[in-house]
A protein has these predicted regions:
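N-terminal presequence-like segments and the immediate start of the first folded domain
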Residues: 1-58, 62-75, 81-116
């Protein structure tokens, strides 16, 4: 099956950094994990987990909008947090973008993410 790489205009460019935001195979879009960078590649909310989570979800929503979809089309998510104490803040922001029934989501804690 052929794949198509897509660079949405609504989020920061990934040119030269070794990954793409979106790949399409058949009728399915695969979207890379989103981080707290604005469209110009600037970090949003340094030290503010709620601002960073909001930007990541805003990026995801912008990509889906550009592809003609919506957050309601998501069938599986994976969430990475660097600190378990951030879970309540993460959920507060997530609940601004999603409501019950939520898509399946695997949550994992890791040492660091793509932006420090």
């Amino acid at each position: 099956m052929a794949r198509e790489i897509i660079q949405p205009n609504s989020v920061h460019s990934t040119t030269g950094v070794g990954y793409s935001h979106v790949a399409k195979a058949g009728d399915t879009f695969y979207i890379a994990g989103q981080i707290a960078l604005d469209v110009d590649g600037n970090l949003v909310g340094k030290g503010d987990i709620e601002a960073q989570v909001h930007q990541a979800y805003a990026n995801l929503q912008a990509i889906l909008d550009e592809l003609g979809g919506s957050l309601d089309d998501i069938v599986k998510m994976t969430t990475y947090l660097t600190d378990r104490s951030q879970l309540d803040a993460f959920r507060r922001v997530r609940d601004r973008f999603f409501s019950d029934p939520f898509p399946p989501n695997t949550r994992a804690q890791c040492f660091e993410l793509g932006v420090l």
